[in-house]
Every structure is written in structure tokens, then in C-alpha cells.
């Protein structure tokens, strides 16, 4: 049995590992992501709103986040890509997730994925799911 390498201790370490690991070939479909998410046992009863389309997703998310926060809800928001720092992608109650929360999220995904290959985006999305499950948004 191959010994598993130690997980990075920093957010920069995780991002570098994921960039290095990501291959040129991407398998389409959500089956791999769903399987890893189920193994993570990061359950959440939060309402999920998906915003898609070509233009205006960031503005729409910012507006929804602002409305929900002003209404007293606990809100998680996941967007991509980031502008300056990876932390911008994952927000809890209008604040960027801290490095420690993201590192814990990446580690949880890594522990659950086994031999399942994930892209940079998929790993990051599942890490965000873990951060949200821990934060318990409405």
C-alpha cells in the first residue's frame, strides 16, 4: 500500500498541490463530486440558490447576499473565479472565509476522495461545501 503524502498546512500549499495535480483531461459529469460529497458527511439543510448564465452572476450573488443579510439570515456565498485572493470565493455572512476554514475544507475533501480524481474547481467547490456545513448558514 502506498503511503499517502502529508496534507499541506497552508492555503497556499493546498492551492499549489491542486494546480500541480490537475491534469489536462476533464471527465464531465457530477457523479465523482456527488460520491465524494456523500463520503464527506458534510450535511446541510441550508437553502441553495444557484446563479448561472453568461453575465451578471457576481452582481446577482452580491445583491442576493446583501438582501438576505439585511433580512437577518446567515448566508454563505460561493463564487468563482476570485480576483485577488482565493478566500474571496467562499464568504460567510459577507466576509471572506479565513485560511484555517479553507484548509480544513480542503483536508476534509482529501480525506474523503480516496482514489477519485477531482479538478481544481471540483476540489474547491467541495471544500466550500465543507466550510458552509461547518458555518451552518440558513
Where are these regions (language model features)?
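Short functional linear segments
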Residues: 1-53, 60-62, 66-71, 78
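ATP-dependent carboxylate-amine ligase catalytic core
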Residues: 24-26, 30-44, 70-138
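Short active-site-proximal "capping" loops at secondary-structure junctions
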Residues: 55-57, 82-83
Amino acid at each position: 500500500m502506498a503511503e499517502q503524502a502529508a496534507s499541506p498546512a497552508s492555503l497556499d500549499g493546498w492551492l499549489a498541490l491542486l494546480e500541480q495535480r490537475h491534469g489536462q483531461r476533464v471527465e464531465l459529469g457530477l457523479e465523482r463530486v456527488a460520491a465524494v460529497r456523500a463520503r464527506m458527511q458534510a450535511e446541510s439543510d441550508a437553502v441553495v440558490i444557484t446563479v448561472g448564465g453568461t453575465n451578471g452572476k457576481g452582481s446577482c450573488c452580491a445583491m442576493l447576499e446583501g438582501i438576505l443579510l439585511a433580512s437577518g439570515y446567515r448566508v454563505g456565498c460561493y463564487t468563482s473565479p476570485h480576483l485577488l485572493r482565493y478566500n474571496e470565493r467562499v464568504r460567510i455572512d459577507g466576509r471572506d472565509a479565513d485560511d484555517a476554514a479553507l484548509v480544513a475544507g480542503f483536508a476534509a475533501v482529501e480525506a474523503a476522495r480516496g482514489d477519485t480524481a477531482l479538478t481544481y474547481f471540483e476540489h474547491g467547490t467541495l471544500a466550500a461545501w465543507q466550510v458552509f456545513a461547518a458555518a451552518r448558514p440558513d
